[in-house]
């Protein structure tokens, strides 16, 4: 039976997997007290998973602080770890709730203090109140645009609690949002800003059980009295109005303000429970929440220091790439920064905890050109030795080995392109009768259709996990250096796997060309083998910049070919001529004049020229 106000302290709502693999919901108190018997928080949405984890981390910080065990040093952390070794003590939780007078602040439908909401909020937009699916960032929450969106599933009260927390942690910016009021006090936001977890990716460590996971991510920091969570410092309409632009602000003004004032959180506790949205769930008589008032909350300054985010050298959160798995950037995530605040703090913290292994979780979204456009969710897990987290030699080696795989990828792609262009030439050595432009377009389409890179990277992922397990064995601890090359088993195994998977993916991709003489000839001329020299970066001469012609001068017309077009055009002409056994002095002159190269250096202009030519013609074309 669900209680009227649904108290998150007492009512079960947190989805967890226990050590016996049974799934069960817990309330806040029972989840923390029984954290030793819970394997992990688990939800189908990774955003919900890490949002609830951050919510519980903020709660644990406050419990430790209220019980005179503030996590201001690693020594205090050791003390907390010893006292909570069998689960977070319920007496500590009760002490915190009583001393901070927040026992009644965890109810979803409380009249005075609804958790994570603005009491008595009324949004006045024409679409307000919205369907409760508005809390689901990945689901329909407004006017349906697709056939399958006509009947969205409304959340239960438990689901509403989960998505209320995740919507505060994760949300995109928009130029428009609803006006709101509480009583006669009006709030006129100019638009919604990004929620704390939207930019970059969230990284957290996972232990053997929920308690270990919490303690691994409860890093020590100088906690201050004003670093308060949302349940101790309720969001009010007055605070929202104070963050509006001050120009022409009146209580009953209907004019939209130009811009809201953004602010920094006072610490991790406030950041983990940041009220980025002003929300109020409408009370329900059943077990389903139907409507919600939803508008902009407190604006957050760009790039606040988040202890669960990795940052680049310029201080910006690292984004997930739509074209790359997170494992390909693991060395950048683990990279030790000179500024400690720019690194995921749990890494150095875990290295001091005495554990042998841990699991790194990376979750976030890959976004499109438009900031609010999500291409897909990503959630990846890596089991790594704890010693690796602060070993700069191993981290650098991971970056080097992944970089070698990137080098092979470039050659792999070029081989596929070369095969596609050779395939467009008839087996008798004469070009097709169709127009040159059409033939080039056909080659481009073939190259795209046989692209072997997706299969290449997908197969390398398994080998990368093996590399993480075994790479520390390549390091000689006594000598303080890497073992001799012939004894670096993990490194040699990885490099062999890279070359084998490149060959395998290319051979499988070109099978779609068939077994005609044309296909066999194209594949044989280019080859599908890879060698160790392909692991190294390919030399590339610096290319001169294309000079823009001034209006009225020769060559300054609209049809002037770009540098890249000249290069591609010449290579295609050269390929067809080489098949016929002819030379083309005109093409050679065009290339030299167009690229500004000295005679005799044509091979450096484009590294793929010479492989197209039979041996007996190379000296002719390179004169």
Model-assigned labels for residue ranges:
Residues 156-159:
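Short Cys/His-rich metal-coordination motifs, predominantly Zn2+-binding knuckles/fingers
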Residues 161-164:
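Short functional micro-motifs and their immediate structural scaffolds
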Residues 150-153, 276:
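Residues immediately within or flanking Cys/His clusters that coordinate Zn2+
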Residues 1-142, 166-178, 182-623:
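Extended alpha-helical scaffolding segments
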